[in-house]
């Protein structure tokens, strides 16, 4: 495992140098299951992240994901000592039968113990992930799960409606009659979950995310608003957008494209390349073990709108104009086009905040996001 940590650390150093990064606005250690790292490896990874930039503020949102069965006092202490201040716990559902039906390794007892340890030892914010519509899940189960997380201090909850993806174990089990899936009931459960969370005082600030005001995810917010992000580790993805003006992209102004890179999923190949890697700015870059995608401004604009309309705030008129040199109202058809039609149906609206005009979907309109994106 130490070879892998060294490889990740070296890639971070390379990316920071290549894209002229001076500081991080947020850090997210995801997975995979980073909570399986032993305390020494986790400490080494955190130290490497913090030392890779010129300045690392302790106030930076620093998140780590964890599965309940891997949470321990040692893990929590190592994470906190390393600067992590936000813990995301993947609960999904706290019923043993439901968990077994989707092949989860965790159990209800392990979930309860993980939350007990978090309440006892964790000084930062903790968040929980749930899924609505799992096989054999009931309304009572979802209600109890959300209440459990809220009563134990989770200030941010992600709630996803289950959708079957072809080729997954769950899809195969459903096809074989071993598990059940009802898309309509999944949507019904999700709507119930939204009602419950809003009753607790949570704000529905993104299509699948709810928060006690003031505890929004800064890392996810950057992703939704097309901020640049680096991805290090096997299978990780990073994107540097043209519209953010990164100096590295200006080296070839004729190209006028951003870049997205997806690291190889082959862990051995990843480690063999990166564990001894060294590079200094100005040196020729060797062929990297990743797939590269050039992103033109048309694609960037499409993704900007797609991600922005996922949020309750929506897309800002001034930000859009500064980034793409276009009028947002005209692009969306605010008067007689697609946005105008949705607005007449009370599925979209225009709001103003701090002098900025925002175009967004209403609470009801967010339920039909995919249809809206097709129409615009």
Regions found by a protein language model. Name each.
Residues 317, 350, 369:
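Short active-site-adjacent structural elements
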Residues 343-354:
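A short, conserved structural fragment
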Residues 355-362:
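Minor-groove-contacting beta-hairpin "wing" of winged helix-turn-helix DNA-binding domains
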Residues 363-376:
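Short, amphipathic alpha-helical interaction segments positioned at domain boundaries
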